[in-house]
Structure formats: C-alpha cells, structure tokens
C-alpha cells in the first residue's frame, strides 16, 4: 500500500485528527494509475538529532508562556489564595524552570549512556536526581 506524505502541524495538545475515509479511496485509485511518488523518509533518529542541534542553538523559551503561567498560579493556590504575579516574576520562574529541566535531562541522558543505552528511562532520572542530592 502506498504511503501518503505527512505535513508538519503544530500540536494542539488534543487527540490527533482522524483521516477522512475519502483518502483511502483516493489512494487506491492512485495505485492503479501508478502516479504515486515514493515519500522520502529519514532514518530513525536523524530528525531527533536535528531537533537537538536546533534547540541547543536557540535561546527562546521552550515551554509556552500561558500554560506555564497557569501551572504557576495553580501551584501558588495551595499556599495562598488571590496571589498576584508580575509578568517579570513569571518570566524569571520560567527561565529558572527551563534551565533546571534542561540540566536534569542532560544528566539523565548521561546516566542512560553510562548504562549503554540511548533511550532515557525513569530510573535514569531518579539516579541523576539522587547523585545531585535532590532526592535520597
């Protein structure tokens, strides 16, 4: 069966959109005519490495601002109700949070590599936090 070309879409956080049934019939008719061009696919891991290099070069924030702001406000509700935040304060919290997470993922990746794996697992993150002294 011929493959169809996939285009990059921005994630909305919900379920992936379902393909229409009409595409199946269109694909079958295209196979008969033989006009389907083979789709170029990168080898597994190539796109991941490209994304790693891209995000290591960039300096912009990786988490969206509004979802992060909602999370901060939700956590702050547990301590005191009706707290107000300056936008600079939330920006500083986001910078610090992202720097912490990036460092943690770097250490987690080193733990996975030490175990002769390329896939990080929860036990790698637990080991990284334990070595850092964050959790016993």
From Swiss-Prot:
Residues bearing PTM Phosphoserine: 11, 29
Record keyword Phosphoprotein present: yes
Chief location: nucleus
Gene3D superfamilies the UniProt entry points to: Histone, subunit A
CDD domains (UniProt xref): HFD_H3
This protein's GO CC annotations: nucleosome; nucleus
Record-level Gene Ontology MF annotations: DNA binding; protein heterodimerization activity; structural constituent of chromatin
UniProt PTM: Acetylation is generally linked to gene activation. Methylation at Lys-5 is linked to gene activation. Methylation at Lys-10 is linked to gene repression.
Signal peptide: none
Annotated stretches, region: Disordered: 1-20
Protein location: Nucleus; Chromosome
UniProt xrefs under PROSITE patterns: HISTONE_H3_2
Subunit structure as annotated in this protein's UniProt entry: The nucleosome is a histone octamer containing two molecules each of H2A, H2B, H3 and H4 assembled in one H3-H4 heterotetramer and two H2A-H2B heterodimers. The octamer wraps approximately 147 bp of DNA.
Family designation: Belongs to the histone H3 family.
Protein's recorded name: Histone H3.3-like type 2
Origin species: Caenorhabditis elegans
Gene behind this protein: his-74
């Amino acid at each position: 069966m011929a493959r169809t070309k996939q285009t990059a879409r921005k994630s909305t956080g919900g379920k992936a959109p379902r393909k229409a049934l009409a595409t199946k019939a269109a694909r079958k008719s295209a196979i008969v005519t033989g006009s389907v061009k083979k789709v170029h696919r990168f080898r597994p891991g190539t796109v991941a490495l490209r994304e790693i290099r891209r995000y290591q070069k960039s300096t912009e924030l990786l988490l969206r601002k509004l979802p992060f702001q909602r999370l901060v406000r939700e956590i702050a509700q547990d301590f005191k109700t009706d707290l107000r935040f300056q936008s600079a304060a939330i920006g500083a919290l986001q910078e610090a949070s992202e720097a912490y997470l990036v460092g943690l993922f770097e250490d987690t990746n080193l733990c996975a590599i030490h175990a002769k794996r390329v896939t990080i697992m929860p036990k790698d993150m637990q080991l990284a936090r334990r070595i850092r002294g964050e959790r016993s």
